Design a protein with these regions (language model features):
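N-terminal Rossmann NAD(P)H-binding glycine-rich loop of SDR-like oxidoreductase domains
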Residues: 1-26
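Rossmann-fold cofactor-recognition segment
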Residues: 38-53
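NAD(P)-dependent short-chain dehydrogenase/reductase
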Residues: 146-193, 199-200
Length: 293
């Protein structure tokens, strides 16, 4: 299979490309990894996905069988002021990929976010719940989803949350560094979600390539917690002698509104290709053990 990975230099894009290179994921070996695949890695410096003519030209030249879109503008606060940049990356780019993929009959896997929801509920969101984004980031990601639905027939939209991995910057690495350097950290306790190991998500995205179970998916670590609880577990598993204190969202204001409760239920994975996301504590433990070596 000829596969294009966009956003290939990001933490998820690199995780996926590494899986193809070594022939297995941290969770096993999806069937497609046993095949001989032609993997193309592209990032913003090689292709601006907001330019439709460039995207179509590449797709018509290379004739990809599938595209995994990991490209996004994920600085949630900066999206509030850089709205055009956010729109180009998170909405226009996915639209262009959908148009180009449809022209050549390619599958499109697109990574989205829990921020498409209002975050004011008390039970986990399922894939068919109504979207109501509260931030510029959430709005642009939602628009990206809608464009894909409009222009593609062979799509997988996979919403994830609280992603961390071996590559690039992320919350887990940041908290470990702060705890080591300062011996204390203060973290919000009234925002609830699902910590997700990029290795788990990569495994599931690769599995989707072998199916035609198109639609919207949720892909997150099993179980939910607050950022405060997440940080306490990070510090504890890392064996760092540091104090973790709770604070409220009101005590820690940010330019972009965060969802108070955005826990996702992986209903589609559970009922179609199979849900193998690890409990978030288990996945975090493995990550920290591997990352400390």
């Amino acid at each position: 299979m000829k596969i294009l990975i966009t956003g290939a230099k990001g933490q998820l894009g690199r995780e996926i490309s590494e899986c193809f290179e070594r022939g297995y994921t941290e969770l096993g070996c999806p069937a497609i990894l046993k095949e001989k695949n032609d993997i193309h890695l592209i990032d913003i410096d090689e292709l601006d996905i907001s330019k439709l003519s460039d995207v179509i030209a590449l797709f018509e030249k290379e004739r990809f069988d599938a595209v995994i879109n990991c490209a996004a503008f994920t600085n949630v606060n900066l999206c509030e002021t850089e709205r055009e940049l956010a729109f180009r990356a998170n909405a226009l780019g996915p639209r262009n990929l959908a148009i180009a993929a449809e022209k050549i009959g390619a599958k499109l896997i697109h990574v989205s976010t829990d921020y498409v929801f209002a975050g004011n509920g008390s039970t986990p969101y399922v894939e068919w719940d109504a979207c109501e984004p509260q931030s510029a980031y959430g709005h642009t990601k939602y628009l990206g989803e809608e464009y894909i639905k409009q222009f593609s027939t062979k799509y997988f939209i996979v919403r994830t949350a609280w992603l961390y991995g071996y590559y690039g910057k992320n919350f887990v690495k940041t908290m470990i560094n702060i705890a080591k350097e300062k011996g204390a950290c203060k973290v919000v306790c009234d925002q609830i979600g699902n910590p997700t190991n990029a290795a788990d998500l990569a495994h599931h995205l690769i599995k989707l390539l072998d199916t035609e179970e198109y639609g919207v998916y949720h892909g997150t670590g099993e179980g939910e917690c607050s950022w405060y609880e997440f940080t306490k577990e990070i510090v504890s598993l890392s064996g760092i002698n540091a104090t973790v204190s709770p604070c409220t969202t009101d005590e820690y204001p940010t330019p972009a509104k965060r969802p108070a409760y955005s826990s996702l239920e992986n209903m589609m994975f559970k009922t179609t290709v199979g849900n193998e996301f690890r409990p978030w504590r288990e996945a975090l433990k493995v990550f920290i053990e591997n990352n400390s070596n």
